[in-house]
């Protein structure tokens, strides 16, 4: 799950599926050794991190977040998973701001994407 509203939805899915809940957090929020990646946002730059021991090699990962706009955060999350030698199998977003193209870009890169609500971003 991507910080922080993604935690609300992903924790419920994790519980129902009986799968681990792994947090992708903003910089300097995790206490142990981390993988880190910087990425561009519409309004600047950001960093997200994951504990190095959260993912094992060849894990299949479902990334859940509340919203996708341009897809920058989702792409950064994918890179963090890949650094850990795991694989993103799908994304779930509660809201897709469809005219900003993030969800479409993930699909073009052969990711499975489910959006619960499509809403214009402008």
Regions found by a protein language model. Name each.
Residues 5-8, 28-30:
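Short, catalytically relevant binding-site loops at active-site mouths
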Residues 11-12, 33-35, 101-104:
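Short, well-ordered secondary-structure micro-motifs
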Residues 1-3:
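Short glycine-rich phosphate-binding loop at a beta-alpha junction
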Residues 75-122:
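PRPP-dependent phosphoribosyltransferase catalytic core
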Residues 19-61:
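Short, glycine/charge-rich flexible loops or terminal/linker lids adjacent to PRPP-binding catalytic cores
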